[in-house]
Design a protein with these regions (language model features):
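Feature marking long nucleic-acid-engaging regions of large polymerase/nuclease enzymes
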Residues: 15-178
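Long, charge-dense accessory insertions within large macromolecular proteins
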Residues: 1-16
Length: 178
């Protein structure tokens, strides 16, 4: 995809194709920031790469995954927006308790096959803390300490998250966890 004017290398990036119903081209909402696309009638151009050689080169140099960090200021330009941030906030704010049945359904739906944190029991229901579930996707050995916009001290020690994750944690252009 490309959105003009092409002012920087992130104005044109390679996306993986998945055929879906409908007559419009779609891409993940989190990928809009580098294109400066805001859905007010923005025009995007789709370029189809013709040769195997060109496809290989584009995958190496132009994939979205290669442009998460902006060269302008070294921060993440692609990150959580809207529902991602709200979900992370609701999952980690306070002492969020999730019943084991719900956790199993969600982790099963995404194909999780790793180990689970230690379960706890509240009011006769077995479950997990929201921060423990979020910690499943944070790499072991990752450490971080910052204050969230809501004023909570967020500490990630060896991949274990404590505190409230908000835009400062996973937001585009602001995400400390990214």
């Amino acid at each position: 995809f490309n959105r003009q004017p092409s002012l920087h290398r992130m104005s044109m990036m390679v996306h993986e194709i998945r055929v879906m119903p409908g007559k419009t081209f779609r891409f993940n909402l989190a990928d809009c920031t580098p294109y400066n696309a805001d859905f007010d009638g923005d025009e995007m151009n789709l370029h189809v790469i013709q040769s195997e050689e060109a496809r290989a080169e584009a995958k190496i140099l132009m994939r979205v995954q290669e442009h998460i960090i902006t060269p302008r200021y070294g921060g993440s330009v692609i990150g959580g927006i809207h529902d991602h941030i709200s979900g992370a906030y609701l999952l980690t704010h306070g002492d969020r308790f999730l019943p084991k049945k719900l956790v199993m359904e969600v982790l099963g739906a995404v194909g999780w096959d790793g180990e689970l944190p230690e379960s706890i029991e509240r009011d006769g229901v077995t479950g997990y803390l929201g921060t423990d579930i979020l910690s499943l996707i944070v790499p072991t050995g990752f450490n971080l300490d910052y204050t969230s916009r809501s004023g909570d001290n967020v500490i990630v020690k060896d991949g274990k998250v404590t505190g409230t994750i908000d835009k400062r944690g996973i937001g585009a252009e602001d995400g400390r966890l990214l």
